Amino acid sequence: MSFKEAKPGERGKNPEDHGRKQTASWINGMEAGNQPSTSGEKKSHHWRSYKLIIDPALRKGQHKLYRYDGLSFSMPNSGVPPVDSVRDPRIGRIWTKTKELDLPVPKLKIDEFYVGPVPPKQVTFAKLNDNIRENFLGDMCKKYGEVEEVEILYNPKNKKHLGIAKVIFASVKGARDAVKHLHNTSVMGNIIHVELDTKGETRMRFYDLLVNGFYTPQTLPVGSDLDASPTVNETPQVVESVKRTKETAIGPSVTPNSSTPFSHDTAYSSSRQGTPNSYSQFTPQSQGTPHTPRLGTPFSQDSSYSSRQTTPAFHYGQDSGFKPRRHENKFTDAYNRRPGHHYVHSSGSYRGTEHTFNVTRPQPEPVQVPRTPPLSHSSGNYKSAFSPYQGNTVFPQTDESQYPQTSRDMEYRRTGPQTSDSYSDAGCNSASLELKPVKEKPEEPPPPEPDSTTEQKASFSQTPERCETPGTPTLEAELQHNSLDTRIAMLLKEQRTQLHLIAGDQNSDNEIRMEGSPISSSSSQLSPIPPYSSGSRYQDVTPSSRPSSTGLEDISPTPLPDSDDDDEPIPGTASLCQNSRSASPIDQINQSGRKTESLDKKELVAGDETPTSEKMDEGHPSSGEDMEISDDEVTPSPITSAECAITSSSVISSVIPIPPPGFPPLPPPPPPQPGFPMPPPLPPPPPPTHPSVTVPPPPLPAPPGVPPHHILHHPPPYHHFPVMQGEMMNVLGNHWGGMTMSFQMQTQMLSRMMQGQGSYPYHHFMGGSMQFGNQHPYRPFAISAHLTRGQPWPPFPKFDPSVPPPGYEHKKEDPHKATVDGVLQVIVKELKAIMKRDLNRKMVEVVAFRAFDEWWDKKERLAKQSLTPVKSGESKEEDKQKTKEHITSSLLESWNKGEGLGFEGIGLGIGLRGAIRLPSFKVKRKEPPDAALAGDQKRIRPSHSVDDEDEESERDRDISSTASDLSKKDADAVNNRRRPARPLDSEGEEEVESEGDDGETSDKEDSSSEKEDQDDGSVSALSSKKQLYGDKEGDDEDDDTQSSGKEEDLVSEEEDTTSVASSRAEMDSSDESEESSEYESSSDSDEKEEEDDEEEELVFGDDQSEDQDLGQEYEVETDREEDFFRENLSECSSLPKAGDVELEDEMQKVEEDVARQTTQETLHLRKKNLDVPLVESKECKQDTLDKVEKLFAVPMQEEVFKEHEKAPSPMNEEEEYIELQLEPVPLVPEGAAPAAQEPVIIRPLTPTGAFGETGPVLKLEEPKLQVNLTQFATEDEELYPRTPGRDTAAHSDTEVTFQPGLKVAPSSLPFLPSHNKEEECLLPPEKHAGHLTVTKMLSEEDLPRTPGRDIVVKSSHLGKSQSTETVPATPGSDAPLTGSSLTLTSPHIPGSPFSYLSQSPGIINSGIPRTPGRDFNFTPTFPESNSIFPCHPSGKKPSVDEPDEKSFKEPTSASLTMNSVPSPIPFASPPRGLPHMDIRLGADDLESSDTPAYLSDKLLSEESECEFTKVHLTSTDESAPSPPLPPAEKRKGDRSKKPLSAHEFETEKNYETSSAVAMSEGALGKQMFIGQPDAVSGIKDPAAVPLDFRNDSLSENTVHEPIIQKVPLKELENQWNEVLKEEEDITKHKKSRNSRHNNRYDEFSTVPSPEFSPPRAMFKPRSEFEEMTILYDIWNGGIDDEDIKYMCITYDRLLQQDNGMDWLNDTLWVYHPSTSVYSPKKKKRDDGLREHVTGCARSEGYYKIDKKDKLKYLINNRSLTEELPIDTQGKSIPAQPQASTRAGSERRSEQRRLLSSFTGSCDSDLLKFNQLKFRKKKLRFCKSHIHDWGLFAMEPIIADEMVIEYVGQNIRQVIADMREKRYEDEGIGSSYMFRVDHDTIIDATKCGNFARFINHSCNPNCYAKVITVESQKKIVIYSKQYINVNEEITYDYKFPIEDVKIPCLCGAENCRGTLN
């Protein structure tokens, strides 16, 4: 805007009025003559806005023509039509919530090109003591102000101190103070000479004199004048005085301005200082309340330009407004002194504009400020743009309240317009703007005429910051304008490209100033001032000051009368807005937008109309702050909707500057935020009709005629991002506490928060601060807003309100942004690739070593197994498991412990899954292949880290995992077989042992589970793993682990679990061990489930645990279940080892009894849902169940093994195990039952096979095995994966009473993975009660869960509801679980195709033995009752739809004869056949089936819990009917041979899960479908199909059963126990996961989702902050694949929803690689390693590492390494990994010692050398406490092991002597020469290895030995003793005694004191 020089009075008036209510006279732009400047006139007119339509400065000979409020004209017959519809041209919504953009203002370089008075900030020191250095001098000067540069001059020839120095202060005040206080003072004995040396001329003169030798530093002639006072040009002094006034006004507050080098000098200096307003970013500029005086504003002292540049538009406004305010006071004199200074003041007024608006704030010189209202164009205006424009809008009064905001806006504007000199209007504007000290309420803009001088004075006083040039008259400013504009434009261009923040501030200023340039056209005086003098500083120079020069700015929030108006032809307001320096409309709009935004915010902050001056001061400082505060404040501020709308429109239009030619059009401004009235979309601003704004501000990319929006001031919208960053950081820092967030994260979160607030329609960035205010939460907040506010270049067509925020929203981005981004992307990608490569390499190495060790261990174990299958296998398995556990533990430890589980720890985007996955690069997945080999199973497990196993096993669990699980289970079985040697005396003991083996198995299982779980949720998997590992290590550990992972759940559940555990303990030690696992799992599980599980646990603790675990994580559950099942099996097997036959008999009896009772009680219980106390049924049934379970465990295991045998790897292992497990499977008490299941699995699951060995039908000792399966299934199942038998027993809901007559082939009853509660619900309790009870009891128990145990566990989840309760009573399923009853008619599934072998004892399914899960035919064994019963999770009705759940999808090759609902497990055998027939079990098998049915109940209940989790897995195995297994006996043999491998068990579990899933309507179907893959892939005999779906039960079961048959029952029991324990561990882990997932599972189970969704853990609802923290943590830690996956899923789901999320429609999902790369980089950073500029240390070359940094990472690394072992020890999991490593190392060392003992000493050394070379010790060098660097062990080293070879150059003595001298000359004090013998010396000085770092110690832990290898002598360092991790490697140098002693620093007790 151009203004005639307004009279100071006018100006003061106008700005204040402008700042106040623009209803006051906003006549600053009017000539005094045209409109009286009197307040009366103001009152009469109540103009809210004005526009300078004609500016004589632009049109010669014409009078200034102002249009007020779009209707009135300053001249009666203007000939210009009034505006049709008067409204605020500014798009207010854009500015509603402006956040301060902290745009670092580039510092103006004071050089020959500098235009205007140079700010006297440079001080020259002379006669300094030559000891004074930069630091000293800088410290000496800092007390007087911020020091930007300190330079001491030296003689270039001799580098001697010349005694002269240059100190550049950030502020003139600081420089003056320094001169004042330091001149002629004594410093270091010298009286120093200090003077202001603005251009350094004096210093250069001194320098020349000194360098030329004319004087010495002490004789240097320093003029008295120099001494007396710093030489400052008058102009600089004037500027300085002006500055001082500014500074004094601002001075009190420490602001970047004062501290900033240019703060006082000019807007440029402060804004250009590059120091963003300290307060500008998001903090209010006032650094406190938005109303804080500008003094507090960072740039308040500086000019608005600086503030503006530093800050977003508001910042400008704030600083300018603030400063000008203060400056108004101080500069009033200066300004009055020089009319030209009006312009300068206008610049200041830019800030002054804020002051003007601050007129709202109490300010003595609001009148002066009003001059700045013209500045309203400038940043001040911008800031107040909203309300001013709103004021301009038809809302005079309404806007008045807003106008206080406008006042702020005016301040901003004022800042620009204040250069009234520049504007011909300035005078008028000032007069008009002369807002009378109505400071807070310049309701009516004074007529343009009013005190323009005053206003100018105000502007000037405001501008004094810019008044670096204050002395320069406006003309001078004009003269400087071109050069300054050009220069500023160049600077701004640079800044645009370089600093978005700067651009933001500059943009406002530049825009204003650039607009000012046109405005300066309007007022040539102002115009000359560089448009970029955004701040008041360069008022003369800056167009911005020109805008500020007008009272106009103050008068009108949108300085209509700006030069823009003049630029524009009179005819059209729009065209005027466009053409005239868009600044007036646009600038006004923009500035108004800014001002309004800032004002809104300020007002909101300060109150609608705090005294304008105060408010403006505060407002501007708070402009950014206000913008931020205004987020909250905007709503509070009484902005009338009309105002808001108008403001929005005007602001938006203003905000949406027309992109300058050559710049891409600005994107449309973001829609106004909801909640704020949006002004009607302003018609798109017509292109600037005339670049009347003849002076296109060079910085302004916008067309010269179109002044860019203030906010748009800089073409680079990017500025807003930086501003956002700063603001976001500030805001977030405030809001989010100390949470470390990356800028992006802060920005995103702040944006989200802002969006959520939606308090103001104006975008923050539009406001010139952050774009977080974007209207739409998901709208890119920064781009358009940045563009709008940050880019001056897209000037709005004057104030075409039509320009919507969208255009404003997206401003031109930095032209180099794409390039920079591309380069950054490339670099980031490369760095990530490098990091990934390094990580992968490291991981591969680690994995390779580990795999090798494991392979070695496995081989050893296999060898030992062949010798001593039980012991060696066990120990090795344990070792492997431990190793794996360690790995997993270490991986999981931090996460599971909950230490790293926080958002920070996990990285929010990464999650536990990501965390675990990262360490375990799938490289470790060698198990599946190994799993294929029975012998390799162990190896497989070790080879896979738990994480890897979990990750991939879970993924591949159905198929590859099945094999691996089988192999794991085989290994476990081997361990279990070995385990029998150990009595399961104590729960912990057994569990620990089982856990050891199961640990491996669990690892495998976990790996498979985890893979699945990763799909479901790696968190659960992790917790499962952790729990699993904990279980392995011990129940206590497991409890700890789980408790850490799920302490809450444990707390609530522990009691239940404890009771369960106690009852379980009573029942059996195995139960106890299971109990502990279960306890943990239970704790993890929901209490309700826990209670059910407790009851179940009382009967079947393991099953309960499994069920719970399944509930948490079906994948992990499956693994755990396998482990748990193995453990139970082992326990059961081992406990009743002796009485296997008896147990079998008992089992048969129990089966019959249970079948009967189960049928009755199950119905009863299902009705009751846990009516029957579990304890009773458990206690009574436990023994029976144990027997049954063992009986069934063997058959089931056999079946499972057969199924697994079908799987390649499991078969082999099983076969290996077969011999071991040939022993009869002893029935295990309740706890043993699950274990028995595995043995059962060992035996063929065929009806006869399952009970082939056992013989007797499974019978529960208690006639009634009453287990409330449904409830347990629902709760416990979800929470606890159940052991097949235990689940059955545990399911109180379905009291499983095995009727003596009832026989169920173990395979008949698939251990269905139960949907957490879905399946349970599926089967009506009534229906389930009778048939399902028997079925469940028999099926679950009969069905061995080891392979099928997963099924059992899953089935138990399902099983509770599925088997007896939940499972629809398929004819066979509902039928009492007689042998046939066990046909796994998916009990949960109504008429599930697979029914238990035969619901009635008499029915036999063609005698085909079946795998517990697979054997189940989908066709109802008996259509009678079970077939009809759909399995519904409690409350769910069976629906065919449910089948969409994968397991239920389709019973493979199973006819869904039962109900339309496919049975959970498709059976190969005909669906309808006797259960025996289906399972192919003889009577014995049926009996076993009964036991498995019993187990199956548990499993079902477990499965019910896991239903969702495992549905898919289970359905895979279950749904696929397995081909008939070999006869029961054969399978028994096989199973005996081979204990259920983890995979088998997992497969069974999966199968069970599938069954359970199938049973659940949809969930069952879906899970069945999922599970079916195994079955489908190879449907084997039901027996052949392992219940464990992880392993392809098909092959593995087939193979395993024979193996199992061969395996002694003891081994089977051991295996089973191991499996059970493993499952238990898994269960625990799953439980912990399930506790989280169970709730979701329950939900899912209850409402099976059409699509199978992984179980979700239930967490306490996160706060919005937490959500956002997680959401935006991707900015900190990147986003991992998992998060991307889920984000994509969420995106897809959201797209399918009609939530009005329009942004989604505009969002296109584009694949992007994960950005979450866990790399050592962070650790290194943490360790103190510096960040490399290039991003890669390798590219940095050699550089010196600071000792401090070294100490940091030395200490940190050492402490970390030391702590890690401690943590590891403290945590069983970590300890185990270490132990496993240690164990391997010890074994190796033992082997070496053995070998060495066999061979001679020489050979021994050589052997040790080779072996150690083969197995390199992990060492590292770090700072040593002994001397400099030292070598430290990173792993425990056993005594007499080779640590490292001393490597170096092999040289002769002569060379060594020469080198020693040379080294001494070179300053290499350390000696790295090691004498090998008399002739040879190894010199490691220049080349060598880490051995060179080994320090001497008088009490060393190593010794050096010379050995000969291949005729070469080598120095090898051997360990003398056991060396712990992080212990320094030392040896005795054994230097010869010499006269010159070398002190010894070893610090040993027996230290000799010297090395020699």
UniProtKB/Swiss-Prot annotation:
Q: Per the annotation, which location comes first and is thus the protein's main one? A: nucleus
User: What UniProt keywords are attached to this protein's entry?
Assistant: Activator, Chromatin regulator, Chromosome, Methyltransferase, Nucleus, RNA-binding, S-adenosyl-L-methionine, Transcription, Transcription regulation, Transferase
The UniProt record lists the SET domain at: 1817-1934
User: Which intervals carry biased composition (Acidic residues)?
Assistant: 625-634, 986-1000, 1068-1122
Read off the SMART domains from this record: N-SET, PostSET, RRM, SET
Catalysed reaction, written as an equation: L-lysyl(4)-[histone H3] + 3 S-adenosyl-L-methionine = N(6),N(6),N(6)-trimethyl-L-lysyl(4)-[histone H3] + 3 S-adenosyl-L-homocysteine + 3 H(+)
InterPro entries per record: COMPASS_Set1_N-SET (IPR024657), Nucleotide-bd_a/b_plait_sf (IPR012677), Post-SET_dom (IPR003616), RBD_domain_sf (IPR035979), RRM_dom (IPR000504), Set1-like (IPR044570), Set1B_RRM (IPR034468), SET_dom (IPR001214)
EC nos: 2.1.1.354
Gene3D superfamilies named in the record: 3.30.70.330, SET domain
Report biased composition (Pro residues) as residue ranges: 363-373
Top-rank lineage group of the source organism: Eukaryota
Location relative to the cell: Nucleus speckle; Chromosome
UniProt lists the family membership as follows: Belongs to the class V-like SAM-binding methyltransferase superfamily.
| Subunit annotation | Component of the SET1B/COMPASS complex.
The identity of this protein, by name, is Histone-lysine N-methyltransferase SETD1B
